[in-house]
Amino acid sequence: MKKYDRGWASLETGAALLIVMLLIAWGAGIWQDYIQTKGWQTEARLVSNWTSAARSYIGKNYTTLQGSSTTTTPAVITTTMLKNTGFLSSGFTETNSEGQRLQAYVVRNAQNPELLQAMVVSSGGTPYPVKALIQMAKDITTGLGGYIQDGKTATGALRSWSVALSNYGAKSGNGHIAVLLSTDELSGAAEDTDRLYRFQVNGRPDLNKMHTAIDMGSNNLNNVGAVNAQTGNFSGNVNGVNGTFSGQVKGNSGNFDVNVTAGGDIRSNNGWLITRNSKGWLNETHGGGFYMSDGSWVRSVNNKGIYTGGQVKGGTVRADGRLYTGEYLQLERTAVAGASCSPNGLVGRDNTGAILSCQSGTWGAPKIQFTTQTYNLAKNTRNLRLGVHAYCSWTYLNGSPFGGFQQVYSDQNNVWYVSNYAWGNYESGGTISVTCLNLPGAGA
């Protein structure tokens, strides 16, 4: 290369280096802007999440906030309130990257005080540059994003709206975020709270909960796993396999095709225990009870006896077998001897207590039937058994006794004996006679 060309080469190299340096500086600026934009987008998402939580809080507590706010005095919602009620996670920070703190100011709508409107405003910390405010206002997805540039007015993205902070009772400064929640937005939040969701929403159990009565319009609830309720009213039938009740079961009537088993008493306050056919009441443990198998008699199951320490009373009492009494038989009515009676065989008493019986149609004293029996005994008879008699006695001695030993006696069973024999030097008597009296049960 000739010497006179060296200057141009140096000049070309310097120009190239300058262009490269300019490109690097320009790229660094673009990269810096990119990083800032990403940071502001992240801030916008955080503001959107906070605003969404505030919107849900207002929707759930709409009535309460109506009572605590006016058209000029706001109800203020803080980050702590949203975390304590579960609308924000416990790890959500109280301030953003610039140290600004978000709060929501809820007031009544001036034209329709029954409706609520709100504004989310950041305060404190370091102000954002205007470029950041404009970017974040466009990226906020919940409500209408905006910013505060003059310390008094909230301006929407693309300057689409402008509202004085004083309308919401809010205070802030330049370089801060503002989000407008309109009456329509908050009315929708209230409706979201009242809407019953078909599926579970994580962190929102209230969306699967009814807060008022529901009318099914005579339609069915099918494939229900369990129904938990305090009371139930049914105008038709209730069908099921089993039922368990810890309290009372009440109704006008009940029909059971098989059995009813109770662990305690079955009580009727003003009705009957009614059975049909040849059934009645049965004690399963002991096999006794009462039933009717015809139209006349109440019968004992398995012919069980009836035991009571009180009275058994009736028009007539009949025993097909023997009639026993553990004490006495008391006849309360009296009869008069000689008076007419019917039927024969009745037993009564007179006013002195003497027994009377109905004989041939007339009351009379019992007639004692008796017979006599005479035994003629020879000499030298010892302990001759005469048999069972009511009473026996000497009735004849054949001639004067010659002496000896004569005796008529009985044992404890009314068996009578007689002896007639010599005694010492005295000869026994002659032929003797003993006459015995026979009564019913004693000889007769």
From Swiss-Prot:
What superkingdom heads the lineage?
Bacteria
Residues covered by region (Constant region): 1-361
Keyword terms, alphabetized: Plasmid
The record ties this protein, via SUPFAM superfamilies, to: Enolase N-terminal domain-like
Region: Variable region, residue numbers: 362-444
> Which residues span the membrane?
none
Statement: the UniProt record of this protein carries the keyword Lipoprotein: no
Additional info? This protein is expressed by a shufflon (= clustered inversion region that works as a biological switch). The orfs of this region share a constant N-terminus, while the C-terminus is variable.
User: Any idea what this protein is called?
Assistant: Shufflon protein C
